[in-house]
Amino acid sequence: MAKFIKSAHYFDQYPIDKQFEICVIGRSNVGKSSLINALANKKIARTSNTPGRTQLVNFFDFNNFRLVDLPGYGFAKVSKEKQTDLAAIIDQYLGYRQNLCAVFQICDINVLTNDDVEMSRYFENQKYAHFVVLNKLDKVNKSYFNNNKHKIAKFLNISTDRLLCVSAQNNINIITLFALMKKVVIQAKQEKILSKKEEKMSSEEEIK
């Protein structure tokens, strides 16, 4: 059963273990908290109509993995000093968190911005997987995504197989998204096991 664990400002306040983590990040007010609640099938994340409400790193337990909610980029309605602080919080998590196995970038399907493009490009050469989730599908007509997914993928510089559309409000494709997250974690675990085996074999060869 999914549940909230803790909020953290500093790196040394993060949970200390080897549990794999999936991070969700997006511009302020794209519906990250609503999406987390939809995935949990209950309210475990605070929602707000005020952009920039999430200003800490929030950790949620989803049994087989942790879901981590980062502050929204774009930093609407906060001071320059706070913008610098939030950017540092995001950078320290994305740059140094060893538990991180995948990032799901949440975007508003109605409003894609240059901030979204810049963030997507940031993930190009990272060691963890990167997916884009287009939220608020309920706000567009049914054929919009299929008619525009190649254009959207090109704009965000991502392949169409790493693009998913959902509606947190109406629970559209939430089960599909959760299944993808679990699949990514399973793959990360398998890769870690394989890596350990290869390290062991290499060590044994050196001893010989």
From Swiss-Prot:
Its cofactor is Mg(2+). Residues 18-187 form the EngB-type G domain. InterPro entries: G_ENGB_dom, GTP-bd, GTP-bd_ribosome_bio_YsxC, P-loop_NTPase, Small_GTP-bd. The keyword Metal-binding applies. CDD domains: YihA_EngB. GO terms for cellular component: cytosol. Mg(2+) binds at S33, T54. It comes from the Bacteria. GO terms for biological process: division septum assembly. Gene3D superfamilies: P-loop containing nucleotide triphosphate hydrolases (3.40.50.300). The keyword Acyltransferase does not apply. Keywords: Cell cycle, Cell division, GTP-binding, Magnesium, Metal-binding, Nucleotide-binding, Septation. GO terms for molecular function: GTP binding; metal ion binding. Coiled coil: none annotated. Pfam families: MMR_HSR1. GTP binds at residues 26-33, 52-56, 69-72, 135-138, 166-168. PROSITE patterns: G_ENGB. Necessary for normal cell division and for the maintenance of normal septation. PANTHER family: ENGB-TYPE G DOMAIN-CONTAINING PROTEIN (PTHR11649:SF13), MSS1/TRME-RELATED GTP-BINDING PROTEIN (PTHR11649). Belongs to the TRAFAC class TrmE-Era-EngA-EngB-Septin-like GTPase superfamily. EngB GTPase family. This is Probable GTP-binding protein EngB. The lineage of its organism: Bacteria, Bacillati, Mycoplasmatota, Mycoplasmoidales, Mycoplasmoidaceae.
